[in-house]
Amino acid sequence: MPPPGPLKLHVGAGRARLEGWVNMDIQQIPGVDVVCDVTKGLGFDNAEAIFAEHFLEHLALADAVNFLQECHRVLRPGGWLRMSTPNLDWVWVTHYRLDVDDETKRMAALQINRAFHGWRHQFLWNRQMLNEALESCG
């Protein structure tokens, strides 16, 4: 049962519980209200807000687009979606330079992949790709 008041969904909550929100995660851990695989739907309608911080990058591209479409379906008119995700452009600019030797490039590539996979990231977004995906979802 959601808390009283407007429906607000916190997707990928983990241990970062938000009071007054429905805290959702794929794992049953303390503070999670609803355990679900959001790639199969959110299970709610008419939400005022959806918050997903450092979540989208953990989905494969097709699943992420489906999630964004589901957010559009679930949000009531005037509702809002707030997300944060690592910016691929920043990762590229800060970790990979074209004017360095091959060994430095190889080490940068290893560091990026270690960080990318070590945090179980599936797909990194830049602003342009995320904007295009959001616009295509409505």
Predicted regions and their residues:
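Membrane-proximal basic amphipathic "stem/tether" segments
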Residues: 1-3
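Conserved SAM-binding loop
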Residues: 6-91
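S-adenosyl-L-methionine-dependent methyltransferase catalytic module, highlighting the catalytic core
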Residues: 61-76, 80-138
